[in-house]
Amino acid sequence: MNRPAGTAEPPGPPALPLVGHAPAFLRDKLGFLARSAAEYGDVVRLRIGGSTYLLTDPDDIKHVLVSKSDNYEKTPRLNGLRGRRFFGSGLVTAVGAEHLRQRRMLQPAFHREVIARFAGVIAECADAMLRGWSDGAVIDVHDEMLDVAQRITARALLGEESDAVLDRFRAAVLTRRRYQEQLLRSILPFIDRLPTRTAREYSQAHHEIDRITTEGIARRRAAATRSDDLLSMLVRARYDDGQGMSDDQICDEVRTLSVGGYETIAEALTWAWYLLAGDPDVEAAVWKEVDGAAAGEPVTGVVDPAKHPWCRMVLAESMRLYPPTWLFVRVAQRDDVLPSGAAVPSGTKIYLSQWVMHRDARYFADPDRFDPRRFAADAISARPRFAYFPFGAGRRLCIGEEFAWMQGVSILASAARRFRLTLAPGQTIVPEPNVTLRPRKGLRMQLARR
């Protein structure tokens, strides 16, 4: 890695010989990044598995994610053999022209008017969850939100399949996800080649998902009538040259969507319940909204997100304080200069941390305070666009963002209309930065029927 002549490295904290900042980062990922940015400014030089820059200037973030995104790809760890083993050649691992071609193919399936068709699926899954809740019961709301969001994703992907098939699919997805978390936590480059029990379980789950998907593809290709589930849309999708995807490519996309389709919004909902429990005024505003929007309508049924701006603002503020995706990592493919003036040598890792940016007092006054009004239209327009990016931006913007918002608002409104959730005693809630940001030991809450 060669530094352009006449340029100096950005400032950063002192590093240990050989291991750099890795021990400090692994010991307290969120705190280390926040402290580094607070002490050393908008471009911080770190040593975490090589030269790394932590960026906290919105213009620099826009540069990496949008303006020069072709120069900043995901890490080889994700795009290499380890990532490909888990996601295949799906959208999350594709790069360059391959990514653009695949995104253009998939985007129509996620247009707002298309995903609106899944409002009934969301309502049915939310109602099924709420029928299992009872006055006075204590639940782990994190488990509940993960479960309902995963059920919705499975139904949206494979809506034509039987409940038994959907249950097998969901179980396999969970097994694969646990193994992925183990791989991403490990610093050992060869751990995915060890013949462990979890590796065998992963392999079985991988084949189960592909088997279910391949059988579903065959039925949909042979069917005389059209279906509107996502798998059917993938089967019908065409590239610009008129060609469709192979069965293998569709399987790769299903594996990608089966994980990415539920975790972000499940974590956002979990943290939203936690935050609402600590703010009676915001809780009352949500109740007023959901009661008014549903006046004269059945307790169960489809929720209209347009009638629930407070629910959307609560979720947005939840993702500000506790962003499900807490860190993006990119790698510079060529030498570059950021808008802030910092020179970036080829091969430099770039850290963009939602945890750090979303709590920056320059853009969010009293940043640790829960205040959904930050996401009223006038407040949004008053701050830089790239001070807040829970779903990413540019060509890597989460393709399922609209689906996530529809799920989140619908589940929050449906549950808030029927129950009040309060924190169960005897807990210390600590955010754990894993693949997503989650409560370390779950989140137990007591239900009170409204």
List the predicted regions and their residue ranges.
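Cytochrome P450 heme-thiolate monooxygenase catalytic core
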Residues: N2-P13, H63, E73-G83, E98, ...
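Conserved cytochrome P450 K-helix/beta-meander segment immediately N-terminal to the heme-binding cysteine loop
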Residues: L352-A379
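Cytochrome P450 I-helix active-site segment
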Residues: A8-L18, A119, A123, A171-T175, ...
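N-terminal membrane-proximal hinge/A-helix region immediately C-terminal to the signal-anchor transmembrane segment
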Residues: M1-S89, A94-R101, A116, G120-A128, ...
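Cytochrome P450 catalytic-core helices
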Residues: T264-E283, W287-E289, E402-R418
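Cytochrome P450 proximal C-terminal region
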Residues: R3-G6, P10, A34-A37, A126, ...
